[in-house]
Amino acid sequence: GCHVTKHPDGKMHPLGAIASQLASAYANNQNQNENLVKMGWLDRAPDAKTPKSWKDEAASTQDRAQAYLNIHCGHCHNPDGAADTSALILDGSHNAAINRGVCKTPVAAGGGAGDMLYSIVPGAPDRSILLYRMESSEPDEMMPELGRSLIHSEGIALIKQWIREMPGSCPN
């Protein structure tokens, strides 16, 4: 998890907001990145799209699921994160289905794979490692491993729906 010290640059990185999470209006109805520039905290606003909200019922299930995984998993599951060796990229930076876990065999899940073959099996949430780990409360299996003591039923329902709606199949 984020206790791993072997990052590409050899440094630990704190959990915190990323540019896309601040690219939306807040209480003052301003883009928060632009507001930070006005306040002198940033030299310039980073390029960032306004993110979808996982709670936005008007957004597609795909967009909502991606937003949920980004906010809850992307801090470790990104190319420079503590879970970079898993090859499961959930921060929204890679669009290839395999990078998001579709038909991807686990690299570093160990016992956390629950005897399943793929991170995500389209149409089959009950055969998907991603959901298995989200539903687990075992410390060596549960995801995310930081900042969580309860199983998030709303998030699980969303990810189940997303996987159930996915077209395709994986090799047996």
Regions found by a protein language model. Give the residues of each.
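A short alpha->loop->secondary-structure connector
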Residues: 8-23
